């Protein structure tokens, strides 16, 4: 019996030793607050997958697991908003999370994570300065100090230019990295076609071949169909009386497609100017097609009537 137990123990140890599956190990500490659990979460489209979960004991935790390849994820502390970006690989990481001052948190462990930390650093710096400018702008607005407001607006624009220049420098130094493609993919809807193509062309071939790189390429292909100089693709929507109306069926020398909604304050505020433009130029061949984002048909119809929008809807 003793020999059998000994044999089983030897087998168990041997099997354990033979387990060569690559794993990631994230050893972390939490300061500036308390927490019960920490999660490693991955965003997949509109869903969020839990890759790992670990309890927090005496301010420490350890997340372990295995990934098939480089995986962007977030370390999220239970009960806290947001999370810390980590590019998970089967390697060892350290994560020092500061709940009181999240910008002081830091994750280290791989070359890829080191590149990501460069982006995080300039983002945190920009965020701090933007917050200060915003607070000053609110004060100037309350005091109706238009000169100060203009000055602060110029400072903000310069801050954004400086941030983009720093980001471009990191991109240039790491053009072929997964992180460079990932950062750009997160800004798909901030750039028009020309700007996105310009940014994409700074990436290396390996970066372009990553999943975020492919996402950017797909976006560029879609934007190319509506780029300046291209024939706008046709689409068909129902009019207020329920009849289908295609964009190409509207004939005019110049066509304006106006996206709006009854609940959109800036849209409604601009409508009087659009009405004036239509009344002035419609006799010369201007046509307008307003595309509403309303889900409430009654609110849509009422806004059309109230704002005296007499063109195509």
Q: Where does each model-flagged region fall?
A:
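Bacterial Sec-dependent N-terminal signal peptides
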Residues: 1-29
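Short solvent-exposed coil/turn linkers within tandem alpha-helical repeat scaffolds
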Residues: 173, 177, 190, 206-214
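Alpha-helical repeat scaffolds
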Residues: 195-204, 231-239
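Amphipathic alpha-helical coiled-coil segments
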Residues: 157-176, 194-198
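N-terminal "domain-start" segment that seeds a small globular fold
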Residues: 214-248
């Amino acid at each position: 019996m003793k020999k059998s137990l000994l044999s089983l123990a030897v087998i168990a140890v041997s099997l354990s030793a033979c387990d060569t599956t690559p794993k990631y190990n994230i050893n972390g500490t939490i300061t500036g607050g308390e927490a019960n659990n920490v999660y490693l979460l991955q965003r997949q489209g509109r869903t969020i997958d839990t890759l790992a979960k670990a309890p927090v004991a005496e301010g420490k935790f350890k997340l372990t697991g295995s990934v098939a390849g480089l995986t962007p994820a977030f370390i999220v502390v239970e009960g806290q908003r947001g999370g810390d970006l980590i590019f998970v690989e089967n390697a060892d990481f350290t994560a020092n999370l500061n709940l009181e001052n999240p910008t002081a948190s830091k994750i280290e462990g791989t070359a890829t994570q080191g590149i990501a930390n460069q982006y995080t650093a300039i983002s945190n710096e920009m965020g701090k300065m933007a917050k200060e400018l915003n607070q000053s702008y609110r004060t100037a607005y309350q005091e109706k100090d238009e000169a100060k407001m203009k000055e602060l607006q110029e400072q903000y624009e310069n801050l954004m230019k400086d941030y983009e220049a720093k980001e471009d420098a990191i991109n240039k130094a790491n053009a072929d990295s997964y992180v460079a493609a990932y950062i750009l993919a997160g800004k798909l809807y901030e750039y028009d076609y020309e700007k996105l193509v310009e940014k994409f062309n700074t990436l290396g071939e390996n970066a372009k071949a990553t999943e975020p790189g492919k996402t950017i390429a797909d976006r560029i292909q879609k934007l190319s169909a509506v780029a300046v100089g291209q024939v706008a693709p046709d689409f068909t929507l129902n009019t207020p009386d329920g009849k289908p109306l295609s964009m190409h069926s509207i004939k005019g020398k110049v066509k304006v497609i106006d996206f709006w909604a009854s609940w959109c304050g800036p849209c409604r505020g601009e409508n009087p100017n659009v009405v004036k433009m239509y009344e002035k130029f419609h006799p010369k061949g201007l046509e307008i097609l307003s595309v509403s984002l309303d889900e409430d048909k009654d609110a849509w119809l009422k806004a059309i009537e109230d704002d005296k929008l007499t063109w195509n809807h």
